[in-house]
Amino acid sequence: SLVGSEMCIRDRYTRLQVRTNADTPHDAEVARNFGAVGIGLCRTEHMFFEGEKIKAMREMILAEDAEGRRKALAKILPYQQADFKGIFKAMAGCPVTVRLLDPPLHEFVPHDLKGQQEMADTMGVSLQYIQQRVESLCEHNPMLGHRGCRLGNTYPEITQMQTRAILGLSLIHISEPTRL
């Protein structure tokens, strides 16, 4: 193909190496096909905004204690492992920089009445409970608020789950490079 031959010419003469932002296995595969030599930033929070993943994330956010969070995180772990496996496989040994969960938790919950009612129905709780939780998660300045390492310090089980997903796959890859 024309794109393929252009890439071969580029690879022969360029010194520039491009790393991309990729948050899904599909993004990583597309980036690799366009010549990316790694992922400069994989934002794990972008992995959670669809289907069953968002439900499990919301369950974790609504959990009242560490045990409840661990139960929800046990549902999230296989999703994380599958996403990381796909990303690592697509990158075929190229470097991947992973950022652990960073955004404020309020980004994972609906702010409109219809979405909150759907969440309440799905979770088996009252609309008022959801509204109270959503309000309690809002911050005046979320860019400096409860996110990143502060979130990890408050809820270390989140960091533990993500670390388990990443390192578990890394260990598999080291021992059996073709298994990923």
Language-model features, listed with the residues they occupy:
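Conserved alpha/beta-domain cores
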Residues: 10-171, 175
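Short, small-residue-biased leader/transition segments that mark boundaries at the very start
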Residues: 2-9, 176-180
